[in-house]
From Swiss-Prot:
Gene Ontology terms: cellular component: cytoplasm; kinetochore microtubule; microtubule; spindle; tubulin complex
Name of the protein in question: Tubulin alpha chain
Binding site for GTP: Q11, E72, S141, G145, T146, T180, N207, N229
Gene designation per UniProt: TUB1
Organism in which the protein naturally occurs: Candida albicans
An individual GO BP term: microtubule-based process
Claim: Mitochondrion is one of the keywords in the record: no
Record bears the keyword Hydrolase: yes
Cofactor requirements of the protein: Mg(2+)
Length: 448
């Protein structure tokens, strides 16, 4: 058995977690009360598949291997009273009494530490129920107080307690134009610095990029958070589909980092997903393998605002689902490689890993997204993502040059030196990206 424990931290983490578990339940044929749908004697996905994410009780109920953590009770109360309230184990929903007030230091040093032992105790019990724990899947935002502060604290502790296990993050990155709090740049830089050596692979998701996808592809004039979360859930589901269903090329958690992370610090793959279209457009789309593969290389299908045409690809994973044949995939990849727009770094010429899972994608009931017979999720480690770091670093510098809002952090027991240390670490990260993008054999040097 290769189990995975999902940990959702903070408001964004918990709400994305809700959308994901609703989708997983539908994909495996599990009802909101945890029992199987009529006519099924086993969950869809084979004996091995569903047990990576669900544990089975003696009465035949399926319980998610998931933990919800927040410093204020509102979001977790929604889970406790929502449609899926009977699905989760009540002790796996952990809420504090007061929130982190968008302050990394409150989540990391003061309020967050008070509930840390409860969380770790619960994680320990969940890992004891696993035969062969594969790793952790972390969902949180980088801009909030709980997601950044408590999220990074928890990752640090898990590194100490479960050093060899994989730790994958889905991190909501602050959107360039759509901001929910003034101090997002501080929280993002501080949490990235703290988690850089603890997370093995971080898939970033940026609200603005997803807003644009909802507006452009799903015809939603004013997308709300549930529309965004349903789209993010599709991506998370595609990334984890190979762990939950049978396919010709199965990928496990360790394989992601082996294939995508050339150096430990450069572990921020760019995520693209196709096809994304509304029900009204569904009948007009051909949706062939080569079409959806090409779409993944267009900036409009990416989960982070940056231009991949300006960067170079170090490694790429294409995870297909549904009615897909290997020959079609090979042709589609050959087509992409022949185009000049896709540049690979010269020290990694092969660059493409393919995963195929035969379970077709499912759309969440009531969501605007139409279900398709096949879909692809592309994870690519490209130097273009450095653009996202440059943006947030610039905002950090503007505020920190005036020491704006710093007293709130220092008042919670943080030292001012941590700000400069974190900023220097991110400057080093930007330099790392520039370095890996430069050619290892410049053409002009022909001396022997």
């Amino acid at each position: 058995m290769r189990e995975v424990i999902s940990i959702n931290v903070g408001q964004a983490g918990c709400q994305i977690g809700n959308a994901c578990w609703e989708l997983y339940s539908q994909e495996h044929g599990i009802r909101p009360d945890g029992y199987l749908q009529e006519g099924l004697d086993r969950p869809k996905g084979g004996e091995e598949g569903f047990s990576t994410f669900f544990s089975e009780t003696g009465s035949g109920k399926y319980v998610p291997r998931a933990l919800y953590v927040d410093l204020e009770p509102n979001v977790i109360d929604e889970v406790r009273t929502g449609v899926y309230k009977d699905l989760f184990h009540p002790e796996q929903l952990i809420a504090g009494k007061e929130d982190a007030a968008n302050n990394y230091a409150r989540g990391h040093y003061t309020v967050g530490r008070e509930i840390l032992d409860d969380i770790l105790d619960r994680v320990r019990r969940m890992s004891d129920q696993c035969d062969g724990l594969q790793g952790f899947l972390f969902t949180h935002s980088l801009g909030g107080g709980t997601g950044s502060g408590l999220g990074s604290l928890l990752l640090e502790q898990l590194s100490l307690d479960y050093g060899k296990k994989s730790k994958l993050e889905f991190a909501v990155y602050p959107a360039p134009q759509v901001s929910t709090s003034v101090v997002e740049p501080y929280n993002t830089v501080l949490t990235t610095h703290t988690t850089l050596e603890h997370a093995d692979c971080t898939f970033m998701v940026d609200n603005e990029a997803i807003y644009d996808m909802c507006r452009r592809n799903l015809d939603i004039a004013r997308p709300n958070f549930s529309s965004l979360n349903n789209l993010i859930a599709q991506v998370v589901s595609s990334v984890t589909a190979s762990l939950r269903f049978d396919g010709s090329l199965n990928v496990d958690l360790n394989e992601f980092q082996t294939n995508l992370v050339p150096y430990p610090r450069i572990h921020f793959p760019l995520v693209s997903y196709a096809p994304v279209f509304s029900k009204s457009r569904a009948t007009h789309e051909a949706n062939s393998v080569s079409e959806i593969t090409q779409s993944c290389f267009e900036p409009g299908n990416q989960m982070v605002k940056c231009d991949p045409r300006t960067g170079k690809y170090m490694a790429t994973c294409l995870l297909y689902r549904g009615d897909v044949v290997t020959r079609d995939v090979q042709n589609a990849v050959a087509q992409v490689k022949s185009k000049k727009t896709v540049q690979l770094v010269d020290w990694c010429p092969t660059g493409f890993k393919i995963g195929i899972c035969y379970q077709p994608p499912t759309a969440i009931k009531g969501s605007e997204l139409a279900s398709a017979s096949r879909a692809v999720c592309m994870l690519s480690n490209t130097t273009a993502i450095a653009e996202a770091w440059r943006r947030i670093d610039r905002k950090f510098d503007l505020m920190y040059s005036k020491r704006a809002f710093v007293h709130w952090y220092v008042g919670e027991g943080m030292e001012e030196g941590e700000f400069t240390e974190a900023r220097e670490d991110l400057a080093a990260l930007e330099r790392d990206y520039i370095e890996v993008g430069t050619d290892s054999f410049p053409e002009e040097e022909e001396e022997y």
